C-alpha cells in the first residue's frame, strides 16, 4: 500500500499545487479536505480522474449530489431522521410518548419533532405534550400503565435538561413499577459528565451517528496506542478526530483490500465494528455519491451499564 499525506492548508491555491503532482491522478481514494472552499475543486478533480473522494468533516456542499465517487461521512442531521424514527419505533413498539416543550420554542429540533410525530401517528403510537414547568404530579398524570412511557424534550439544550431532570427523577423514584425512559439527542453526550447519575436512573437513550466511551475495550486500546505513538493524550472533542480518522481509514482501506474496484457493489458486506463512527452508505441518487446514514442508540441502563445499540 502506498500512502501519501499532504498539508493542503486553507487555500485553494495550496490544494491546486498538490493536485498538479503526477501521482495524484493515480490515487484509489482521497481523504479530505478540511476546509469548505477546497471541497468543490477537489471533487471536480476526483470526478475527472475517477477517484473516490471521502469527505470526513463537512456537512455542507452539493458535491455528493452530482459526483458518484463522493462519500460524505458527516451527514446533515436531517438525512438521519428517517433512520432514527425507524429505530425508535422498532425499539419501543408499545410506546406512549410524552413531549416536554420549553417555554421558548427551540426551532433547531422543529423538523425532527414534526417528523417524529408524523411517524408515531402513522404507527398508531400514542403521544401527548407537557411543558418544562410540569410538576411531578403533572408528569405522573401523563403516564400510561399499559405502555412504555418515553419522555422526549423538544430541545436538545442542556438548560432544558437541567430544568426537567429533577422532576423526572422524583417521578421515577415514586413510580418504580412504571416503565419510564428519557430519549434525546447526539449533543447529550457532551453533557454526560454533568448528568451521569440521572441518566442511569432515568434509563436514558439518545441517538447519534458517532459514540465512544473510554471504558469500551477498543477505545482503551486505541487511546493507549495513540499515546504510545504521539506521546500525547486524545482531545475530548465530539467526535474525536483521531478516532474518526482511524474508523474512516480502516473502513475504506479494508474495503479496497477486499473488493478493489468492486467496493461500491459490496458496501453492505462491510460489517466492521468501529471505535466511534459507524458506516451505512446510501447512494443519494442515480448520478450522485453516498451519504452515511448510520445511527446508533446509546442507552444508560438502571443497572449502570452503558449499551451501544446497533440496529443493522
Regions found by a protein language model. Give the residues of each.
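Extracytosolic ligand-binding ectodomains
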Residues: 1-312
Amino acid at each position: 500500500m502506498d500512502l501519501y499525506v499532504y498539508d493542503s492548508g486553507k487555500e485553494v491555491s495550496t490544494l491546486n499545487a498538490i493536485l498538479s503532482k503526477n501521482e495524484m491522478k493515480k490515487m484509489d481514494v482521497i481523504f479530505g479536505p478540511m476546509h469548505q472552499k477546497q471541497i468543490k475543486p477537489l471533487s471536480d478533480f476526483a470526478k475527472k480522474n475517477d477517484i473516490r473522494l471521502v469527505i470526513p468533516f463537512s456537512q455542507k456542499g452539493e458535491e455528493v449530489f452530482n459526483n458518484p465517487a463522493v462519500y460524505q461521512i458527516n451527514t446533515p442531521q436531517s438525512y438521519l431522521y428517517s433512520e432514527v424514527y425507524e429505530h425508535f419505533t422498532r425499539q419501543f413498539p408499545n410506546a406512549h410518548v410524552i413531549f416536554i416543550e420549553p417555554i421558548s420554542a427551540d426551532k433547531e429540533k422543529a423538523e425532527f419533532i414534526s417528523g417524529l410525530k408524523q411517524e408515531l401517528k402513522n404507527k398508531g403510537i400514542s403521544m401527548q405534550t407537557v411543558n418544562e414547568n410540569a410538576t411531578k404530579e403533572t408528569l405522573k398524570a401523563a403516564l400510561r400503565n399499559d405502555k412504555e412511557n418515553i419522555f422526549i424534550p423538544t430541545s436538545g439544550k442542556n438548560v432544558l435538561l437541567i430544568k426537567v431532570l429533577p422532576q423526572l427523577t422524583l417521578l421515577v423514584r415514586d413510580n418504580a413499577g412504571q416503565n419510564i425512559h428519557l430519549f434525546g439527542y447526539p449533543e447529550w453526550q457532551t453533557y454526560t459528565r454533568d448528568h451521569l447519575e440521572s441518566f442511569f436512573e432515568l434509563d436514558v437513550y439518545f441517538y447519534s451517528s458517532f459514540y465512544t466511551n473510554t471504558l469500551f475495550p477498543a477505545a482503551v486500546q486505541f487511546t493507549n496506542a495513540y499515546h504510545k505513538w504521539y506521546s500525547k493524550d486524545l482531545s475530548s472533542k465530539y467526535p474525536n478526530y483521531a478516532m474518526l480518522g482511524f474508523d474512516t481509514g480502516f473502513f475504506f482501506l479494508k474495503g479496497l483490500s477486499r473488493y478493489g474496484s468492486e467496493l461500491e457493489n459490496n458496501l453492505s458486506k462491510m460489517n466492521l465494528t468501529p471505535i466511534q463512527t459507524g458506516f451505512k452508505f446510501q447512494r443519494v441518487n442515480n448520478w450522485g455519491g453516498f451519504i452515511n446514514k448510520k445511527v446508533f442508540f446509546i442507552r444508560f441502563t438502571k443497572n449502570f451499564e452503558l449499551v451501544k445499540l446497533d440496529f443493522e
